[in-house]
Amino acid sequence: MEHKERNESIRLKMLDEIADIEAFSKGREAAELTADKMWQKAIVMSLINIGELSKAFTEDYIAAMPEIPWKAIRGFRNIAAHQYGIIDFDDVYKTVTEDIPSLKAALQAQGE
């Protein structure tokens, strides 16, 4: 697969994960979400998948989007996958409501 096709495939998979996060979170408040174990596991798994997918982009693709905190995305993935017990779900909610929309917008812009 060519780099361009590979990057596009990864971008679309990340957008699918974001769509899942949006569906899981729609209409729910922080207190409700942070108390819901099923939500926690679903959201964290999608965030892990986003972090894992981000490692598969080519360096050129990553460099073209400096506004995205790639290192932080990968770092969260590592914490969530290996040190799940220390996750602060208030921070996860903040990520879902503040960071995911900007990631979505940047990924969508790359497809235009």
Give the positions of each predicted feature.
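Solvent-exposed interaction patches of small proteins and small membrane subunits
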Residues: 1-112
